[in-house]
Amino acid sequence: MNTTRPLDHLVLPVHDLDAAGAFYQRLGFLVGARNRHPWGTENRIVQFDGAFLELITVGEGADIVPHQLGVFSFGAFVHDYLSAREGFAMLVLASSDARADKAAFDKAGIGGFAPFDFARKAKKPDGSEVEVSFSLAFARDPLAPHCGFFVCEQHRPENFWNKAMQAHPNGASALAGVTMVAADPADHAEFLSAFTGIRAFSATSAGLRFDTPRGVVECLSDAAFAFDFGIAATGEGPRFSALTIAVRDLASFEARLKAEAVEYLSHLNALIIPPQNAFGVALRFISV
C-alpha cells in the first residue's frame, strides 16, 4: 500500500476573517463564503486542484473543547495559536483512510491521538447549502509544539471541490509547497519522513525537502530561508513560515500586485509578499 501523502490544505489563522478574505481577493483569488464548524471556528476557503488554503478564525459564541489526553482539539490549537500570532498553524496532508494513517502514526511513534470525524454545512457559489464531512488523524512532532500536523480524509468530495472556484483571475494553478523553519532541520527529518510517508528525501546543509505527490514540504534553516526568500523568517523556534503558489503568468501577477499597491519583493525568479503584509505568513509566487 502506497502511504505517500500529498498536500491537502494549510490552516491559516487570522483575527479578521473577512479582512483576510478581502486581501486574497485583492491578490486575484476566488475566496469562498464563510463556513462554521460545529465547535465555532469559522473559515473561508481558497481552492486549487486537490488542495486548498483554509483562512480561519474563532467565531462568536465558539464552544472550544480543550486538549485532553489522547485527544487533539483542532479548535483549541487554532485558539491558542491566535492568542500569540496570526500565520500558518497547521500542515494537512490528504488521506484515503484516516484510521489506517492513525495506525501508521501510532506505529511510527508520532501519533497517539484518537481520530476525529465531523461534518459541516458548506455554501456553494449559488448560495445553496450542502454537507461536507471529514475524518482527521493527528500527528505530533514534540520538537515543534507550535506546528500542527494531521491528515484529512474527505467523505463527500463531490460537495467540497468546485472547479469554478479554482479558476482564479490571477492565474494561480497550484499549491506548490510549504516551508517550515527550524534551527536544525535535521531534528525533524524522522518525523517529517513518517508524516509524509516519504523515505527517500533530500537532506543538505540548507535543510530537508520532501517531494509529495502534490507539492513540496521543506524544512529550512533560518539562513537558508533568508537566502531562498530574501527576507528573515519571523518568529522563534520551529514554525511554518511560508507557502508557495504556482501561477501561469508571473509578469501578469506582478502587474496585479502593483495595481493593488501590495508590497512585495522580487527574489530568485519569484515574487514574495512578506508575512507582515499577508496576515503572518510569507507568500511566494512562482511560474508554473
Task: Kindly give the residue locations of the regions a language model identified.
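Short acidic/glycine-enriched loop/turn segments that link adjacent beta-strands
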Residues: 38-42, 267-269
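Glyoxalase I/VOC metalloenzyme domain signal
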Residues: 1-7, 13-32, 48-117, 123-288
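Short beta-strand scaffold segments in enzyme catalytic cores
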Residues: 44-46
